């Protein structure tokens, strides 16, 4: 019986220490080197009611630079891609046609290293 309790306690300790932040707490997905202006945009979104669908931010490498894609706050809006200085590069998707603003038609094919930076996990 002591061995069973010891194994159980060890298993609980292992599971507790292996908790995954990306599953349990999406807020912790942000890397430490996120640009201040991108963080400010995320903080701004957090200060208003939850979007429908909830906001998300992904980083990509596009044309040899790290860029950030912000989801739109509602239907038929552009999904905006910005650089590390928060300069708008383009909107590769969204809008009435779903094809974006046409300024980066190669984004879907050439952007690499998609990484979820933040997803709004608040409930409506």
PLM ranges: what are they?
Residues 14-17:
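C-terminal motif of bacterial Sec signal peptides marking the signal peptidase cleavage site
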Residues 94-124:
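C-terminal partner/receptor-binding element of secreted or periplasmic proteins
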């Amino acid at each position: 019986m002591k061995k069973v309790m010891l194994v159980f306690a060890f298993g609980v300790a292992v599971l507790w220490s292996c908790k995954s932040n990306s599953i349990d707490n999406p807020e912790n997905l942000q890397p430490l080197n996120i640009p201040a202006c991108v963080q400010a945009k995320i903080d701004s979104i957090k200060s208003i009611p939850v979007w429908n669908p909830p906001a998300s931010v992904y980083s990509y490498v596009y044309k040899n630079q790290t860029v950030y894609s912000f989801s739109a706050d509602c239907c038929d809006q552009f999904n905006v891609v910005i650089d590390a200085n928060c300069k708008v590069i383009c909107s590769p998707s969204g809008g009435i046609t779903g094809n974006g603003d046409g300024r980066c038609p190669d984004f879907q094919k050439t952007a690499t290293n998609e990484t979820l930076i933040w997803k709004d996990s608040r409930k409506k």
